Amino acid sequence: MNFTELAKKRCSVRAYADKPIAPEHLQAVLEAGRLAPTGKNHQPQRILVVQSPEGLAKMAQAMHNTNAYTAKAVLMICSDTTDCWVRSFDGHCIHEIDASIVTTYMLLAATEQGLGSLWVERFDTEILRKE
């Protein structure tokens, strides 16, 4: 499938099949994130892969939604603000832009692998920090 077909096919998925994700499919998604362009190739993203039932339950708790994660894996895209490219004219660290690019690449790769995906930004970071 070409890029336009892939972009048209990608959509937000909120209910997932009750079957495991093939390791090679997960690796392909992670590799897409690694290949994504970032400011001066600093690669400030840190990707946490959550697959255990306990970890997925904690993610649901952080979203204040016990039904939030029927997925078999959740990828948390984080940024290291000490390892990002900083614009010289205003001192702004572009880690959020970089993380967004990485996430977009990974969402498209998930679609290419036949996996459903959902970009979620509604979560309580304090709950995640404690856990």
Task: Place the predicted regions along the sequence by residue.
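N-terminal amphipathic, basic helical "cap/leader" segment at the start of enzyme domains
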Residues: 1-73, 78-79
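Small-aliphatic-rich amphipathic alpha-helix that forms the alpha element of a beta-alpha
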Residues: 33, 75, 84, 90-131
